């Protein structure tokens, strides 16, 4: 079992889980039921499993040629493609099953993120804008949480804003992460901002995306929260976004540690409403 958890990077759910619950509590007028919160957790876990596993399968040959990634389960031979396909199937059963239990509306919309999960890994073979595929995929988390409560498109502006924040934030941190592969991407003919513009210019783009992300969060605060108790968390999220850029040379710190905290800070801000 440890092999499978390591394969799908279960700890990376720390990025998406606070965001999907941010969507839930942003939409809720009262405390959601435990049942709904559990179904949302199952859906998020299933979606994360599908996304990570599809990415590993589609990129298996690229990972094999990259010294940074050639020890991953598939290129290293510790997991077969058929085993990985089985993981995708389990993730789909969990995801679609939970979406159905949440509402018929969520079940109807549930294939949309899967399309993004499939298309994104191929995008870097054609365009440097592939970073936005990561952001778009993760932005489905808070929007999914919103729909889990609302069950319709009515009054969707707050849900759209938290989704836009996630899109800009996640795209920005994916650019930071991709600086690790600047040299390999150039040699392999893969597209990314670092491989096209160089890491220095790519990090400027990442900074711009995070400025826009914080601006979106401010707009959400003014429109939907506007609570004095939430203000410190808004300010803290801005400080953390700044630190993520300031410490971008230390990808382990910026990508994994600071990012995990940002999601929970944004959730705390919404809980204060």
Task: Go through the PLM ranges and name each one.
Residues 21, 41-49, 86-97, 111, ...:
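Generic alpha-helical transmembrane segments of integral inner-membrane proteins
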Residues 38, 42, 60-110, 187-230:
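Multi-pass membrane catalytic core of lipid/isoprenoid biosynthesis enzymes
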Residues 50-54, 58, 168-183, 187:
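Membrane-embedded alpha-helices of multi-pass transport/permease systems
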Residues 5-6, 42, 72-157, 161, ...:
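Intramembrane alpha-helical segments
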Residues 2-15, 78, 124, 192-204, ...:
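Membrane interfacial helix-start motif at the N-side
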Residues 9-26, 135-139, 263-267:
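The first (N-terminal) embedded transmembrane alpha-helix
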Residues 212-215, 219-273:
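Extended hydrophobic alpha-helices typical of membrane-associated regions
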Residues 22-42, 94-108, 143-164, 216-229, ...:
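Helix-coil boundary and interhelical linker segments in multi-pass alpha-helical membrane proteins
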